[in-house]
Amino acid sequence: MNGHSDEESVRNGSGESSQSGDDCGSASGSGSGSSSGSSSDGSSSQSGSSDSDSGSDSGSQSESESDTSRENKVQAKPPKVDGAEFWKSSPSILAVQRSAMLRKQPQQAQQQRPASSNSGSEEDSSSSEDSDDSSSGAKRKKHNDEDWQMSGSGSPSQSGSDSESEEERDKSSCDGTESDYEPKNKVRSRKPQNRSKSKNGKKILGQKKRQIDSSEDEDDEDYDNDKRSSRRQATVNVSYKEDEEMKTDSDDLLEVCGEDVPQPEDEEFETIERVMDCRVGRKGATGATTTIYAVEADGDPNAGFERNKEPGDIQYLIKWKGWSHIHNTWETEETLKQQNVRGMKKLDNYKKKDQETKRWLKNASPEDVEYYNCQQELTDDLHKQYQIVERIIAHSNQKSAAGLPDYYCKWQGLPYSECSWEDGALISKKFQTCIDEYFSRNQSKTTPFKDCKVLKQRPRFVALKKQPSYIGGHEGLELRDYQLNGLNWLAHSWCKGNSCILADEMGLGKTIQTISFLNYLFHEHQLYGPFLLVVPLSTLTSWQREIQTWASQMNAVVYLGDINSRNMIRTHEWMHPQTKRLKFNILLTTYEILLKDKAFLGGLNWAFIGVDEAHRLKNDDSLLYKTLIDFKSNHRLLITGTPLQNSLKELWSLLHFIMPEKFSSWEDFEEEHGKGREYGYASLHKELEPFLLRRVKKDVEKSLPAKVEQILRMEMSALQKQYYKWILTRNYKALSKGSKGSTSGFLNIMMELKKCCNHCYLIKPPDNNEFYNKQEALQHLIRSSGKLILLDKLLIRLRERGNRVLIFSQMVRMLDILAEYLKYRQFPFQRLDGSIKGELRKQALDHFNAEGSEDFCFLLSTRAGGLGINLASADTVVIFDSDWNPQNDLQAQARAHRIGQKKQVNIYRLVTKGSVEEDILERAKKKMVLDHLVIQRMDTTGKTVLHTGSAPSSSTPFNKEELSAILKFGAEELFKEPEGEEQEPQEMDIDEILKRAETHENEPGPLSVGDELLSQFKVANFSNMDEDDIELEPERNSKNWEEIIPEEQRRRLEEEERQKELEEIYMLPRMRNCAKQISFNGSEGRRSRSRRYSGSDSDSISERKRPKKRGRPRTIPRENIKGFSDAEIRRFIKSYKKFGGPLERLDAIARDAELVDKSETDLRRLGELVHNGCVKALKDSSSGTERAGGRLGKVKGPTFRISGVQVNAKLVIAHEDELIPLHKSIPSDPEERKQYTIPCHTKAAHFDIDWGKEDDSNLLIGIYEYGYGSWEMIKMDPDLSLTHKILPDDPDKKPQAKQLQTRADYLIKLLSRDLAKREAQRLCGAGGSKRRKTRAKKSKAMKSIKVKEEIKSDSSPLPSEKSDEDDDKLNDSKPESKDRSKKSVVSDAPVHITASGEPVPIAEESEELDQKTFSICKERMRPVKAALKQLDRPEKGLSEREQLEHTRQCLIKIGDHITECLKEYSNPEQIKQWRKNLWIFVSKFTEFDARKLHKLYKHAIKKRQESQQNSDQNSNVATTHVIRNPDMERLKENTNHDDSSRDSYSSDRHLSQYHDHHKDRHQGDSYKKSDSRKRPYSSFSNGKDHREWDHYRQDSRYYSDREKHRKLDDHRSREHRPSLEGGLKDRCHSDHRSHSDHRMHSDHRSSSEHTHHKSSRDYRYLSDWQLDHRAASSGPRSPLDQRSPYGSRSPFEHSAEHRSTPEHTWSSRKT
């Protein structure tokens, strides 16, 4: 396409970079050019007739009309208006103007292209389109940042392809001023309809433009699906925002330059991204006048509308795809249809959902409606934030008519990937402060620099007597005294060069002290950063807010979000492009992002690293710890409320992190402080003083009101008692094992009982239709729990008093029940648990804390974040169920009892009397008191027990004996009540309950810290407790479960179980089959399972009776995987499969699986568990698999369970094996790795970018470092230099993930071959004697690798096929390559010495064709196009042999055609050259290179000739019933030996003869290895047969290889092949007794061969059904089975063969 357009000159005035030619429009802020730039087919056909003289002249016109009146209008009226003034007067027009440019660009591109091509040929235009695509698409990828960067590709005019005449025509026809706009005639409802001429000055908003971000990719995808016409198909990249704008309205002021351009037939339209809201509004109050900025300027067209008095329309608030929320408009269904917008399905879905909601609201109770309305209000508030600019991150280089650049805006509550370009005039009117801050940041002199002198030498400390003016921000906030002291302590530590731990108790303002300290460094010592703050996601917004409040002069960037967001930050927020100095002072990020981008973030020298919630670093073996400790930093600060949790080792880990030189050895630290509690901690306290500061509230906040805790004990309801007894009875067997039982079993029972103590619904939820009305439902809800009966009374009393309540529970399902209860009672509440994320969480907290808030309750999960959640506006805390870990409950209380609290805080802990809950509380009290008292002397707070060993499991502080005793607690009393006569708890007045409650007030006293730690425990007198008292009493008087649970209840349970078993025995056959199948697929048999459970070696009868366990995969008991949840195990296994040698790559796996808190020991334990479990599962299932033979259908393969996670053993091991070559090839040392280059020659990758050997090497390094499939991570690593090469923004450009996967598979195969080749050379070098030994040992080795072979044969085709391929490649090509190398060394041609050391002629090595040659080859090979396409696409459902035959036939057809083509040449050099060229062309259709294909073809020809000769021979020999076969004859010569020598004809012996005959093909043949146990008769197969299979085996492997990209198990398992082949060969080699039969077959074959020109050995390629038929109809010695197309052997050989073969192998030959 040619020609500069007036569109471009217009853009120059509006802040767009001028571009033309191929890149027309692609750099616009909206990105429209690129999309349209790629459409050519449609436009060339549309405009073909009439654009020959006019198309290029009016190329810039977006929607050209053919009426001349419009042109006259343009020439008559070109007035100019000051853009800024005009906009101020008519802001509502903005939405119209924003699209003017967008809609011009696509048309311009379409009209210019036909002018340049003029071919009208669809093929030509599409090929020119391809080249356009590549350049314009490339520009489009960068349009996010190039519009504003001076160095961006948007600024230079890319006019290389433009013809001068076109340029001049453009210049002469248009003067390119901003006012060149003209009204169009078609009105869109989104635009105001009566302002046509006044808008001339305003082209501007093209840039407000679409968001240029990841949403464009979505546009493209949606668009791809649409493809409504040929033009659309070409225009894959169009984004909808432009699409709709193609339609021109009378309100769009565009100038038509020159003559008319024909109107396109197919227009492109806007797309609905989301329907945000719905209303009934005034008729006509829709379109552009309803945007937020138009409403602010002109007023709301819907204002004052009353539904009763005037008719209205149902209107929908539309978020347009590619536009920010500020441009949302109200539309009716009618106006949307008029505009022909896309995405109407979204509107239909919204309407359906809205109708459902309305129906529900009609029948819902008032409190449900209230709850719904509150939720809606929160959502609306959130949506409003999307219209507020948080910060501006870029501006365009050129200014618009209004004299303002466009701005790139980040919106509040949305990630960076949702940034969008907006019009300068609009943003300056609404968000001028953001613009000022942006320019202030850009011009700031206070950016980090490396030569700051205080980094090299710390200054002398000068104490701050009063708060400096720079701290406190604009609002003049004041630090409290202790916070100023804390700031001084932090400053003192920094000056002394001590990194430190700020361990103030929760609620004392650690965040503010940290920010003030950074502010101090910034102002006092001119240290401007960079400061890195690593914080949990939950507190990130509060950190951001506090930085803005307390240190607004510092530029803090939040480094968060998906890869697009982070790339955006790196592009715009990271550094100044000119000076390369960092822009930010503080970088805020989370642990997870830090680990994802550790290579990038770890490359900076940080002046300061601060870690919030630093107890996450307590494990010095975790990946997070190892990653962060390696970061380069000048000073470190850890911020934690709980520096000491479980052991002294954890405290040492924190100290080692901040001061690795001082606290270098744990052993020394333990020796010094770990022993002797009397004096050890005093010395420790002294040593810690310079590094650790901890204050508690009572020490510093005298004003903090009292905290009173009461333990309220209540009885269970009757239903709870029933359920409680039922749980114990049901688990009688597990309980009666006592200390022999499993911890996990006891814990599970205990969790069930704890659920029962909370509420019956947690055990058995009610049916939906169980209750008739709300009142009944509420009563049942309350009566189902003793705790809720009490809570109900308590809340009613608190509501009367005006208290506000926080209710904590560990169980989210319990929170659901409480929420339901609160709705029934119509108590307004908020809720926060782990599932409520980010912005919604913030909204809920703010809503509860707001002045005059109506909220009465706040439901919280006890563990909802560590979290700095401040709910000081509440004065009552109800702990519904106590946590195992008292510190969690303590944190819960601190949500309310913290700075800012004015009232006394009452804490009510609910405990069920006579249940496990009560006993847990008592035991925890006894067990933990002493240790907490010790901790208090150190003035540090810990969670549980202080001891020097490693931490006990935080989830279960009790051992089996204690758990057993806890479970018995209260059970006896409970069973004394007869079943069905359980008493309801007696009614009691709430005041009476509170009076009786165990109460504890936290008055300050000498033991206040201990009391604080044990605030949940009422301990009468600490001093009376000697250590002896703490010892837990043994279960002296405890009864057995037989005595506790009545016998009749036990009998009834057993009877129920028996009935269940009988039911299962008679269950439907279909269900039985299903169970069997599960058992076959994954689980071990009943026998091994019963052994495991019962401990006996034989089948236990009771186990055999239990069909219900039949299909359960084996489970590794939970004790083995302590510390990992099921979700974590799943993540671990997913990552485990991405790495070769996974047990050596645990750090990478932990990073990928986000398990960085786990220690290497735990990870190794889990890794070994996975690996050993897989191997064992495969071993156990091998017999079953063999029996199944080549079963059709998908075989899932053996599975086993780790905890609750099912693992497919076959798949895991397959992935492990597949990636071993990569693991072995890439150096583990990072420095060596940087130098790595792939040692093999690689075929060119046909990507849309330059891709060479270096990129292949970097891709492999990336896979090694980040795991197979982690393409995003690989893209982000700057060291790999693939950032701009892989995963381009344009989804139509390669390489995307699919291409990368294919390339990676290919490269790993090359590595595998290379390794195999080297190994073979090493073995060759070892000499012949060793080789003989190897062969002798082979049979032994086979046993050891049985499991591995099983894996390979069964698993995803990749690994096994790869090994086959490696060996084949070796076996096939090694002898020839030796010969070839000898020749090539002699020849004069230049050679290239490869990594394997073999010279390859340079001419041969390069297998690329230039474009011209490629085109010639393409034409010449057109007659065999079908064969080329089918070469790697056999029909589905073919057996492997049929596939193989299919390939051979294709190859013969192609080769014959090439031979025909070469006949026109007489010059031998030409023939040689063109033969090579044509075969290189053929190689593009398959994985094999040209040489290999040619070789295979030659071999096929040879076979064809032999087959013809043999068929002649066969017809002659048939009369004598003998087929001559040199190999057979040779074999017969040896039959004169005695039996022993006959028997010694093992596989190896025969093969050695064969090797002599056909060069040495023995080394590394894994294929033969795997056959060894499946094909006992293969050793006697005749030599030709061997050769035959080997020559073509690669092809079938290749097909399987291709299949792996579709479905791993689509074809039958690979075992099937050897067994078929073995079976066939057996038949071929049996002796011939039935001569007539034999003759019949050979006659048949000879006739068919002449007909089909097939090799005599094609007999091998029988279809599956024939083989099945023959196998079924004949025994091993039946006449039919003994026919052979080749020679025969004597009966002696036959019997010898049978003697050497175990009889059972016949079963494995079944197909």
UniProtKB/Swiss-Prot annotation:
The gene is Chd1. Its EC number is 3.6.4.-. Its main location: nucleus. It is found in: Nucleus; Cytoplasm. This is Chromodomain-helicase-DNA-binding protein 1. It comes from the Eukaryota. Residues 790-941 form the Helicase C-terminal domain. GO terms for cellular component: cytoplasm; nuclear chromosome; nucleus. Abundance is higher in cells representing early stages of the B-lymphoid lineage such as pre-B and B-cells, than in cells representing mature plasmacytes or other cell lineages such as fibroblasts. One of its GO terms (biological process) is chromatin remodeling. The 2 chromodomains are involved in the binding to the histone H3 methyllysine at position 4 (H3K4me3). The CHD1 helical C-terminal domain (CHCT) binds DNA and nucleosomes. Component of the SAGA complex. Specifically interacts with methylated H3K4me2 and H3K4me3. Interacts with the FACT complex, the PAF complex and the U2 snRNP. Interacts directly with PAF1, SFA3A1, SFA3A2, SFA3A3, SNF2 and SSRP1. Interacts with BCLAF1, NCoR, SRP20 and SAFB. The modification Phosphothreonine is found at T235, T248. Belongs to the SNF2/RAD54 helicase family. Residues 270-362, 387-450 form the Chromo domain. Residues 121-133, 214-224 have a biased composition (Acidic residues).
